[in-house]
Amino acid sequence: MSNKQILEAYRLFDRASSGDYRAKADMVESLTTSDFPQLLGRGFNTKLAAAYQALTPVWSQYSTRTTVQNFKPQTYKQLLGYNGLELVPEATEYPAGDFSETKFEFQARKYGRRLGLTYEMIVNDELGAFRNIHDTLAQAARDLEGTATADALLNGKRTDVNTDFFKAANGNAPESAALTRKSLQEAIETVSQKRDVNGRPLVRPNLVLVVPPALEFQAREIVNASQIRRTDGDTEVTSANILAGAVTVVVDPNLMRSTHAKASKTWFLLPAPNTARPALVTAFMSGHETPDLRYKNDQGNRVGGGSIPVGEGSFDDDTIQYRVRHIVGAAAIDPTFTFVSRGN
C-alpha cells in the first residue's frame, strides 16, 4: 500500500464529496474492493494528523507539555532545597549537600469515538457530511486537550476552582479581588516573594494571566497600555504603565466550563510553560501523541467461502466503522508561582 495509492483514494473521496458524479460512481464501485477502505482510512489518518498539527491550542500557552509511557499514575519529580555552592578553601574537601525531592502525580487517559459510514449514505448522496471529517476530528482532539487542561484548574465537578491545589497550605488560597491594575500588581508581588524549603528566595519566572473571555479586553488594557492617564485635581497626569509587558494574557473559553457564579470574573496568574516549576502539565502517551483513526474489519465471511471486502459493511449493521482515539491527561502540580482570584 503506497503513499500514492493512499493519496489517490482520498482524492477520489474528496471529488465525490464535492459533487463530481463520475467520482461518486467510481467510489461506489471502489467500495467493493478489499483495499479501498484501507486506503481511504490511511488517507483520513494522514489528513487528520495534518489538520491536528495545524491547530494551535490555547492550553500550550499556560501548561507544560510532557509525554508518558503508559496509563499508570505518573510522578513528576523536582529536586529542591539545595543550599547553593560554598567556598572551597585550598586543599580541602568539597562540602556535601543534600536535595529534597518533591513529587507530583498525573495520569494520561484514553478518549475516543466511533463513526459509521454506510453504503446507503454514499448512494443517497450524503457524502457532504463527511467531506471535512478530518478537520472535525482534529478540532475535537484539540478541544479535548483544552478541556482536560482547563479542568485541572477546577474542582472535579467544575463548580469552583481547584481548592485541592489553590489553598492556604500551598500559599495560594483563592482571593476575591476584581481584575484591576492594583490587584494584578499585588498578585505579581505576592508570587515574587516565594522561597524554597530552605528559605532561599526564588527567582520569579515569566508569568501568564489566564482569563475567561469576559475579562479579555480588561486584561489586555491593563498590560498592553504603554501609558496611564489620571486626573490629579485639575491636572491630567500621564505616567508609564509599570505593568506593560509584565505578564502575557491568555484567554481560555474553557474556563467557562465552571458553573461557579463568578466563573466569568475569575482570573489566574500562572508560570509560563516549560519553567522550572510548572503549575500545570498536559500529558500525551509516547508514540501515540496525535489522534489515531482506524476502520473495523468485522464483515464476516461468505457462506460458500471466501472473504468479504470491508467496503460491503459489517456483519451486524452494514456500516464501515471508523474509530478515532486520543490519549491525553492534565494535572495541576506545582503551586509555587500561582495565584487565583474569583473577582468580586
What are these regions (language model features)?
Residues 108-112, 204, 315-317:
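Short, solvent-exposed loop/turn segments at the edges of secondary structure
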Residues 1-34, 336-344:
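Intrinsically disordered, low-complexity terminal tails
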